[in-house]
Amino acid sequence: MSMDLNFWKYKEGVTHDNDRIYEKACCDGQPVEELESLPIDEILTKIASVFSDWTALDKAHYEKEGQGAFEVFTTSQIVRFDCYGMQEADLNALMDVLIGFGCPLYDPQISTRFDEWTDR
């Protein structure tokens, strides 16, 4: 099974339009005025640390025998994981990394952003 997990952080006081942000920023890779810039290098370093027992084919592609694989796509404002055959615990580990940077998960499979803990 494959799925994508998407993360961003809104600027303070802007209107939230999750579907538009997903399409424009996460799918098309375009900058969006309503979003904060993210510390992408720090995020990638944290991902590499958390998944240090996985094979890193490069900074954006990870795989592990029997555990699946994932690809990381970033712009200065978003992080998107395309996940293939991953276990729930590993998916949760990806989510935890981005939550640590104040970025809630948006799941396009159900058109839901899990942001009840933040207004950003």
Predicted regions and their residues:
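Acidic (Asp/Glu-rich) sequence patches and key acidic residues
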Residues: M1-R120
